[in-house]
Amino acid sequence: MDGWSEVLRIPSSVFATDNYNNPTTIVNITSLQFDSVQNFIWCGDSRGYTRSFTGSFATNSLYGNLQLYPYTKFHTSDVNYNNPIKQILSHREGILSLSNNAISFNSRRGLSKLQVTSKTFNNNATTENKFNNLQAMTFNCNSFNDVVVGTDTSMMKFDLNKPNVLSSFDHQGGISLLNNLGKFLTIANSNGSLDIFDPVSNSTMKTFSAHNGFISNLDVRGNYIATCGYSIKPKRYYHNQPAEYIVDPLVNIYDTRIMRAIAPVPFPAGAASVKFHPKLPNIIIIASTSGQMQFVDIFDQTNVYLYQADLAIPTTTTTTINNKPRMSNLEISENGDFLVFNDNCDNMHLWSISPSSKDFVNFPQPVEQPDIIDSNFEIIDIDANVPLSIVGMPYYKELLLSNYPNDLRFVKETAKLPEPIDIELILENETRNNGTKKFFPYDKLKYGPGNVYKPYQSLKDNKENKEISIPKFISERSTTTTTTTKELKADNDGKFIDDSIFQYKFQGKLNKVPNCYSRLQIQYSKFGIKDFDFSYYNKTKECCGLENHTDNSYINSLLQLYRFQSSIYNQVVGSLSKEWLPNDITTIITTNNPEGSSILNELGYLFDMMFKAQSNNVKIYNLSQVLNHHPNAQKLLNNNELLNLNSQQVRDLVIEFNNFLLTTLHQDFQTQFQENFNLTELKYEIEIKGNGTSCPMYDKHQGSMFSLELITPPSNMLNKMSILINNNNNNNNPQYQPEPISSLDNIRRNLNILTYLEYSMNQYKTIPCQQHNHSYPHNLEIQTSIVHLPSVLTINVNLSNPEFKIINNFTQWLVPEFYAVKSKSISGKNGYSFKEIDHPTPNSATQESGKYKYKYELLGYVCEINHQSDIVSGAHNLVAFIKVNNNGGWYLFNDFLVMPIPEEEVFDLQPSWKKPIVIMYQQTNQPSFNYLTTTTTTTTTTTTFSNAGKYDDSILYRDHFAEGIRKGHQLEYELLTRKESPQPGSLVAIDAEFVMLKPEELEIHYDGYKKLIKPKQLSLARISVLRENGIPFIDDYIVHTSDIYDYLTNFSGIEPNDLNLTLSNRENLVTLQTAYRKLWLLLNLGVIFVGHGLYNDFRTINLQVPERQIRDTAVIYYKSDFKRQLSLKFLAYVMLKEKVQSGNHDSIEDANTALLLYKKYQNLYNKEDFESILNYIYSEGQQLRFKVPE
């Protein structure tokens, strides 16, 4: 740090105000700041002005002395005040200036982008009092748009992109300085203490007592914090003596990794300012008010460089407060080459360690200069008297195009015929490919449809016999034609189907991942998600797919596995028969459960919706929201479809979630219904024994767990067990000849998962005894055994990559069925042994029923698919193989792709990209599914909901507001009575309103083309349900505690704070589960829902309603020839002669209008006049442009 010197001083006369009557008036410098983007020094003064200086070398100097030139000056304080500028922050798009009651955001040219005052925010009436007496500001952690502001009473933040919302932090007390680290905010309190604050958890992580008086300066770099300040001088005479402050001779250093102070740096002159060097974080720059500066190494405090600044001595004409020179506002540039500060005569001093440099940042952007118009531009007038040669021509070294010879001919290169292919290559290729002419394999999914010869095909034949079905938008089915190639497969009806996505195996290519395991993406057209052809990916009739454009969608495959386990399905869905609707403020606010639900409840609703959806797709949004708010699931959240995780991290996440799910289901059953969820519970026993009589140590413990962690046996044990299996299988064969053992790979090929299970369920180890080691050293024997197997055995396979490679060598590691034998070992220990059923027969269980007690079969497993190397992030996805039918039908579930798959593909684990993670075996005597249906069926495996009688539907007949019943509330609806109990076929009108939680994600190309990546995320805000006579019986507003991006007031009628539990004027606020349970009960009771645009409503609510229970007026009054659906407002004007939705939307009004339109349709349909009326509606719409006249 040797070589620093003063290179420039700007006198105080530069900062004089533009007042011609008193030109000697001095403006005090209150803040300084180096720019982080361009070569600027920013200066704030006491009159509320911010100005900038830019550096340049003098043109008339031989050595290029640095000069600072004024660039801009503009007023940044509140327009009604001239408050001093307390702090300046550099932003990539401009400059932030802090005054007493305003924050101004200006471009570097001085143009105002934004001015934030107390009137900017629309939170509530108390905001005006909060956003005053501003003291400090900084950017939020890892964000340049969130600005954190500290006042003399609190701390707040706002977004530069949306500055109308002011959020408060949970921090009390006055703030003098603010700064930010990578994850935390550093707060200098007015009482001299230092707080380490976490903005994510909204809490103070650590508080240090830094200085007795106050902190004068604060700086951070890396993991270190440096502070300097003042202490209160002890009172010597009487207690009412005014407080006096003395500067502390130490600079405090704090390490945020260990959250404590380290060795301070002494500075006898009194530290008033401290800064970290930006390039050498171990170097700090300490300055006193008298101008003494030291460069000190905090790890080697003997390494000190001392400098003294030449400060101007104030005179009585400039100040009358202090006649001593005083230094303030020390700042260092981003590249560490310049220092700037000012004295109390308002002179600005610039120091540098590199006199030949003029850059304040490493890579500065060019400074925008004003346009200079050349006033001496001459215009040449050409008329008949002036020759054209006066204009002049440049000198050309080559001939111009206009000077080409007459015999020159131009030949177009593309007009040449291509060179013929060598006949020898064609003959060689035909010989190699058995006569087929194929040079290179063509990947259609990668490169798109090939440019091949198209044979003639008449339009008539194409429509009637050769219709092509490929994955495309539904709106393009009738207009898009596609070439029929060899990759298109014809079905029994003569139609061609592109089945490349359903390809599950490449012949002879084990390392290439087939198409059916690829990561799928939902495409969005201008018609939205409804236009995407989900039916192409799922041609089954009973298995639904799950969408993957939802947070935590990585659990889709695991949820599919549990949904097809009948015992788990019956118990989880059966729990919905009892009502559990917490609505107290402790649940909603304190425990952060605004949905008023649980993992058990949402999983029950989801399972029921997955059954009712049949082959339609389902979202897991409601379950994901509860998961996001669950306190024990914060480490399990993933909202980017595993793009940030490698192979091992994906396995860890899925297995951890599996354990969390089973444990949470058990806890929810005990909390809600005082029941146990023991379908997957394994009971184990731990026995500790000493060494005979010399060590009488003995202990036994018992416990339980809900899943088994699979452990790979040691290599020597695998070797030994393989030999035993060979002997047992071939002792009775006289022609058997033992083969020599050449390698471990050859030995392991006859092992399977049962070997791993026996080793994992019977663990044995020894540890040194610590209680009797005074006599002689000996060991304790610890044996862990599984003593009880559940009816559903869930196995977590969290193995390393080398261990998975061992499994890849097995011919069939998974077994379809096995017997579990409960027996005692030689030592009398209870345990289990397993035997594979090589050739199961119908009477195999009865023949050996005395020996084998439990018979298990494979239900399915969750499999990780590696598309690239294991260490690559974002190249892995999850699928599930599940045995759906009792007759042995296997299906592959890859999000919304559902397809049958052969059994040999399920048990083939030889490809290295295929790794089982969660395996589920179940006992063969599982009960049948108890599905809830709304109609009487002839099968014995379904239950009619209306006849069940055990489901609690009392919520339909009472109010259940959040925070309890509100007395005196004037209801806009009348509750149902038991006499009005909904029956199958009853008409109810419904309408819902929504708010936006997240905006849509767009991909914008350079040419302006926009592609929708993810749609906007909506949340239910209000639901209204009406009787058939138009009288409402449900009108609920849904509580929201998370941030709402847009209330969509013009469409929803929801005003800000309407959904806030503490600030809302609405009395009928309920939790999301309360409203959802009402709709779920109505759905299962078999009512018919009438509404307008019900597809989007039910999709957002996550309710799967059969088509036979929907009467959608948007579909009823739709004529396919026009390809335009009519709005409810226009239909009401034409059909009912009424004007609705004149102001904000009202869900009761909209539901009643849809009900009247449906009744109108019934009357017209019975009179057989509906088609003519529909034509009249569209003709009127064309004349009015489908808009209601004002």
Curated annotation (Swiss-Prot):
SUPFAM superfamilies: Cysteine proteinases, Ribonuclease H-like, WD40 repeat-like. One of its GO terms (cellular component) is P-body. Residues 512-924 form the USP domain. Positively regulated by the regulatory subunit PAN3. One of its GO terms (molecular function) is nucleic acid binding. Its cofactor is a divalent metal cation. Residues 364-511 are annotated as: Linker. It catalyses: Exonucleolytic cleavage of poly(A) to 5'-AMP. WD repeats lie at residues 24-63, 129-166, 167-207, 222-264, 266-306, 322-361. Its EC number is 3.1.13.4. Binds 2 metal cations per subunit in the catalytic exonuclease domain. One of its GO terms (biological process) is nuclear-transcribed mRNA poly(A) tail shortening. Catalytic subunit of the poly(A)-nuclease (PAN) deadenylation complex, one of two cytoplasmic mRNA deadenylases involved in mRNA turnover. PAN specifically shortens poly(A) tails of RNA and the activity is stimulated by poly(A)-binding protein PAB1. PAN deadenylation is followed by rapid degradation of the shortened mRNA tails by the CCR4-NOT complex. Deadenylated mRNAs are then degraded by two alternative mechanisms, namely exosome-mediated 3'-5' exonucleolytic degradation, or deadenylation-dependent mRNA decaping and subsequent 5'-3' exonucleolytic degradation by XRN1. Belongs to the peptidase C19 family. PAN2 subfamily. Contains a pseudo-UCH domain. This ubiquitin C-terminal hydrolase (UCH)-like or ubiquitin specific protease (USP)-like domain is predicted to be catalytically inactive because it lacks the active site catalytic triad characteristic of thiol proteases, with residues at the equivalent structural positions that are incompatible with catalysis, and it cannot bind ubiquitin. It functions as a structural scaffold for intra- and intermolecular interactions in the complex. The linker, or PAN3 interaction domain (PID), between the WD40 repeats and the pseudo-UCH domain mediates interaction with PAN3. HAMAP family: PAN2. This is PAN2-PAN3 deadenylation complex catalytic subunit PAN2.
